[in-house]
């Protein structure tokens, strides 16, 4: 039986990503491997190529990855990053994710690609990670923390399960530190949350938890570029979604993508790659 979560925001996120509409949309439009923001060389590059480039760039920052490494992916989606890391480095990965539907796709693709012996897919929320203290060499996350109603708790959990000297590499769509009050409300309404994280929030919270910031690669311009690219792909391939994704979902998605693009272009949002090391 699928777990239900008491926190409404967590349960809302779980139900959204478990829905047939969302599952089919991300599989058809986004590609079904990586469902996060991409690093684009040009505006019309395939979404899957740009999304994979983000994974490649993040992994290139790590000094821990190798056959003896143990990685936790917090909010793993369909597990594309975990499979990339397992294939390239031979490391073991715990792919923790809220959506049971996504996790079933993840397990199937792991088997098809011959890496199921390296990847454990875990049905769980990252507010309560079901692993012992200090067992991971690298904690990894892509564009997932924004869905949490308690990001400070998520960061405490990341710190708890990471060994001393371990790495924390993540991305998250964030509210800019100087964002005017109230202007991102349409985005918050879409993701059913009251707040978004900011760069200062992540820096201060992780500093208090004993982390050293190694670098932040600011790729803010890629956020509206990515959501604009998804919007155009949706317009181009909308006919393929008929019978798989409801008209209501498609209309909400178009509106949501437009809000992300507008917020990014106006400087209200920021995005990039954080790289921290635990002391």
UniProtKB/Swiss-Prot annotation:
Keywords: Methyltransferase, S-adenosyl-L-methionine, Transferase. InterPro entries: Erg6_SMT_methyltransf, Methyltransf_11, SAM-dependent_MTases_sf, SDMT. GO terms for molecular function: dimethylglycine N-methyltransferase activity; sarcosine N-methyltransferase activity. GO terms for biological process: glycine betaine biosynthetic process from glycine; methylation. It is an enzyme of class 2 (transferase). p-chloromercuribenzoate acid inhibits 23% of the SDMT activities on sarcosine and dimethylglycine, and S-adenosylhomocysteine (AdoHcy) inhibits completely GSMT activities. The keyword Nucleus does not apply. It catalyses: sarcosine + 2 S-adenosyl-L-methionine = glycine betaine + 2 S-adenosyl-L-homocysteine + 2 H(+); sarcosine + S-adenosyl-L-methionine = N,N-dimethylglycine + S-adenosyl-L-homocysteine + H(+); N,N-dimethylglycine + S-adenosyl-L-methionine = glycine betaine + S-adenosyl-L-homocysteine + H(+). Optimum pH is around 8 and 7.6 for sarcosine and dimethylglycine, respectively. The pH optimum appears to depend on the buffer used. Catalyzes the methylation of sarcosine and dimethylglycine to dimethylglycine and betaine, respectively, with S-adenosylmethionine (AdoMet) acting as the methyl donor. It has strict specificity for sarcosine and dimethylglycine as the methyl group acceptors. This is Sarcosine/dimethylglycine N-methyltransferase. It comes from Halorhodospira halochloris.
């Amino acid at each position: 039986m699928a777990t239900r979560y008491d926190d409404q925001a967590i349960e809302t996120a779980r139900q959204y990503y478990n829905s047939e509409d969302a599952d089919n949309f991300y599989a058809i439009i986004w590609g079904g491997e990586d469902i996060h923001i991409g690093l684009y060389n040009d505006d019309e590059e395939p979404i899957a190529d740009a999304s994979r480039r983000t994974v490649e760039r993040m992994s290139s920052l790590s000094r821990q990855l190798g056959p003896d490494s143990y990685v936790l992916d917090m909010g793993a989606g369909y597990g594309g990053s975990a499979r990339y890391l397992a294939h390239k480095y031979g490391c073991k990965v715990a792919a923790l994710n809220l959506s049971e539907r996504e996790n079933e796709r993840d397990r199937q693709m792991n088997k098809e690609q011959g890496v199921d012996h390296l990847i454990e897919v875990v049905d769980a929320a990252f507010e309560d990670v079901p692993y012992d203290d200090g067992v991971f060499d690298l904690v990894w996350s892509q564009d997932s923390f924004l869905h949490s109603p308690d990001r400070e708790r998520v960061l405490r959990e990341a710190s708890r399960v990471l060994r001393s000297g371990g790495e924390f590499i993540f991305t998250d769509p964030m509210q800019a530190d100087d964002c005017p009050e109230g202007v991102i409300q349409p985005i918050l309404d879409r993701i059913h949350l009251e707040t978004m994280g900011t760069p200062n929030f992540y820096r201060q919270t992780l500093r208090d938890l004993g982390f050293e910031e190694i670098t932040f690669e600011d790729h803010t311009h890629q956020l509206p570029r990515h959501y604009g690219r998804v919007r155009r792909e949706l317009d181009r391939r909308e006919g393929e979604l008929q019978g798989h994704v409801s008209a209501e979902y498609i209309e909400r998605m178009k509106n949501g993508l437009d809000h992300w693009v507008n917020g990014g272009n106006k400087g209200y949002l920021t995005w990039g790659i954080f790289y921290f090391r635990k002391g």
